């Protein structure tokens, strides 16, 4: 996160001018001019489409989009992208069904789904999404060791409050995925998604780190050994690199143990091993005492823009289709939560073709932001 996440605001602000043109013009052709036969479309839906989209237009499984009351010109455009192979990867061979329909059949079945009433929400989700609040809830299992706010009270445990969120995510993923070995950490993290880890990291990063008074008479005796450390971690243990942890004010036992583990190759990090390989135990202990005695500083991380503010920008295009059929953008309210996440992720990662959405979604660095937008819209009443 850090610098990457701080760029988030810049990217979003630069994208605002693009929002006015975020849908493509309808393709010319005869398909849109064909008459719609709702009864014929219903019969086609029963035979070809209901297995996935239901007769009521609700996806029968997670990640299948709801089609009921969707804008018919958008449905037509989407079906054409499948027919032209632009979305083959998102549904595999499933949408080859659309290729087997005649133009009049396709027009009618899409007209049928567009004519259906909006669907009611099945879930009881709130449209409100707060990175901090969600991170606080998800971090409950961390509190026993790291403290409820990330200020630990146990010896040998790192303080997470005020730490760079990008580093917290990186370290948590290493424990979750097993590249760092600690069974207790792996057990607590194994079920957490990337978005979950980001929310937890944001929560801890925004909490104020508490200083602990040093009990050592001369804590600065170790500064002479920290010249190489300072290049990455800062001269006083506060790093400007968001991927590198702050050491200032960390627990002395934790620092002592981890620095030795890098020196002894118990943790894999070539550069750290190279720097530490010649240091003796007592020298590392002095380094740990020095950094532990420094006052911790809070990361300069800027929180992501609130989801409600981002949704207002999305609405500039995705609400206008109700009154302007030329805007080929889908309705998002009440849409399937997982489908929205996967669709936005595909646009962000370049796996779906839409130049406008690529530009807009490229600003969504965080999976948590995508999850938040999906939560916002899926919880709203369909229209």
What is the predicted role of each segment?
Residues 2-8:
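Positively charged n-region of N-terminal signal peptides that target proteins for export
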Residues 18-21:
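C-terminal motif of bacterial Sec signal peptides marking the signal peptidase cleavage site
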Residues 23-45, 60-63, 114-139, 153-156, ...:
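Electrostatic cytochrome c docking/interface patches
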Residues 42, 57-84, 132, 150-176, ...:
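Gly/Gly-Pro-rich "capping" loops immediately C-terminal to redox-active cysteine motifs
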Residues 49-55, 109, 113, 139-149, ...:
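The canonical Cys-X-X-Cys-His
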Residues 97-122, 190-212, 277-300, 347, ...:
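C-terminal capping alpha-helices of c-type cytochrome domains
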Residues 144-146, 159, 164-167, 195-199, ...:
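Extended non-catalytic domains of envelope/secretory-pathway proteins
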Residues 254, 266, 281-284, 294, ...:
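C-terminal functional regions that serve as terminal interaction/effector modules
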